[in-house]
Amino acid sequence: MESLSRAGQEMSLAALKQHDPYITSIADLTGQVALYTFCPKANQWEKTDIEGTLFVYRRSASPYHGFTIVNRLNMHNLVEPVNKDLEFQLHEPFLLYRNASLSIYSIWFYDKNDCHRIAKLMADVLEEETRRSQQAARDKQSPNQANGCSDHRPIDILEMLSRAKDEYERNQMGDSNISSPGLQPSTQISNLGSTETLEETPSGLQDKSALSGHKHLTVEELFGTSLPKEQPTVVGLESEEVEKLPGDASQKEPSSFLPFSFEPSGGGPQSENMGIRPAAHHSVQPEVTTPVLITPASITQSSEKQAPSYAIPLHPVLSPTLPAEASTAQAPPSLPRSTTMMQAVKTTPRQRSPLSSQPVPELSQASLAASQSPFRAPLNVTNTASTSLPSVDLLQKLRLTQQHDQIQTQSLGKGAVAPSFSPAAGQLATPESFIEPPPKTAAARASASLSNMVLAPLQSMQQNQDPEVFAQPKVLSSAIPVAGPALVTATTSAVSSVLLSPSVFQQTVTRSSDLERKASSPSPLTVGTSENQRKPSIILSKSQLQDTLIHLIKNDSSFLSTLHEVYLQVLTKNKDNHNL
């Protein structure tokens, strides 16, 4: 029987530990009890739905005793800790008690012997808890004890912290004396500060610490004495970090993300005025060109149109200018139009990839200038004709850098280099210099008319659409013999410092209006022919195409919208063809 009861107690103890892991043993138990509660409003007892076995147990943490009723009816059990606030009263077969929340309960026992035994055990436990609480109160009020910690307690957290602090200070002082003897005055000063704080503590504590070898410090004393020692070192480290910050920031400043690798160069300082970057910053030559002067006629005409007069900014990181490009930096005003345009193509500096060198807001400003100003419209059309339409092939939009390099090498190898002379930069251009030369052959006239018919509708469609991809910083070879005098004036003013007369701008206005009038009704045949002429000959590799597409899709929302528009157009065309 004893073995069976012991096995049952072990099983019951394991079940109780699942609810409270601090339970160590079972002090007593009884078989059948029921719980009643007293209702003060009705002044009567009410039976609860708790009925089962009563266990009195011991715990390893405060409160050190408690009792519970394991309910047989449902999952709601009674758990009551035993402390000094409990009050018990015996009325056979009931054991009444009141807890700390002033709730009155009554435990009904099936066996009266169990009721007496449990009542006696509860009285002993309550007396022990009362004695323990009184001892704890006396320990807090005792002047010989610091922070209410008694000697017989097994764990003292403040004592452990103070001991660790002393060991750390001794190790730090030994390391500083061995490694750097020059720091001894500072350690002596810190030692003086620590002794001063120790002198402020009561003499009784110092005598006790000298005898026992342990110091009892408060939290303020423990963490207050270490602050003056750590503060100078922290300040010194912060000052060193501040001194190193400017150099590190200048050295580790990340450059803009590029899909391709380019050669870096120390470009000149960028202008901060409306994103304008002078042309002298894109070359390696030390000389600086003089600013372009605009005549009053051009100022009045541009103010009426309210068009911005700044050009599309270029990125300052560029490859060095070739000697042939430097020799053609300034074009004479008396040269024919075709020669001047070839010089403009040659003098255009080599640029980084336009996919990352030009932000989207600047493109929107450039497209606004192209749609409002009649002087800049032909130049913008020739620069961005292949990138403004959604129907243009996407590969043609992505082959920007290779096509630009190929055009530059072809123009430098085949075209005649114009003689460079500096005195002509300050001369005034005459109206005769802008007169078109007579056409040589009928084929040239036909190509000029076809290209004019293509470029004008491209310009009108570009004005109605937002910029979808970054503009190409080049002049297409197919559009070189086609553009009118407006292209000549804009290019020569951007490259050299030629002073222009008012009659030139009047002539460009009339010619641009004539071009727009002629190109009002383009044919599909001419559009297809021009697209075939503008098709690049260099094909990107798979890796370059992948990097470029990933970069544009992640960083350019307009490019993604362009892809979606092209996809919708192709889808609608396929549906229409299927319906037909």
From Swiss-Prot:
Statement: the UniProt record of this protein carries the keyword Nucleus: yes
EC number: 3.6.1.62
Keyword list, A-Z: Cytoplasm, Hydrolase, Methylation, Nonsense-mediated mRNA decay, Nucleus, Phosphoprotein
Pfam families membership: DCP1, mRNA_decap_C
Site, as annotated: (Microbial infection) Cleavage: 238-239
GO molecular function terms attached to this record: 5'-(N(7)-methylguanosine 5'-triphospho)-[mRNA] hydrolase activity; enzyme activator activity; mRNA binding
Domain of life of the source: Eukaryota
Annotated Gene Ontology cellular component terms: nucleus; P-body
Modified residues (Asymmetric dimethylarginine): 376
Compositionally biased region (Basic and acidic residues): 132-141
Stated role: Necessary for the degradation of mRNAs, both in normal mRNA turnover and in nonsense-mediated mRNA decay. Removes the 7-methyl guanine cap structure from mRNA molecules, yielding a 5'-phosphorylated mRNA fragment and 7m-GDP. Contributes to the transactivation of target genes after stimulation by TGFB1. Essential for embryonic development.
Protein known as: mRNA-decapping enzyme 1A
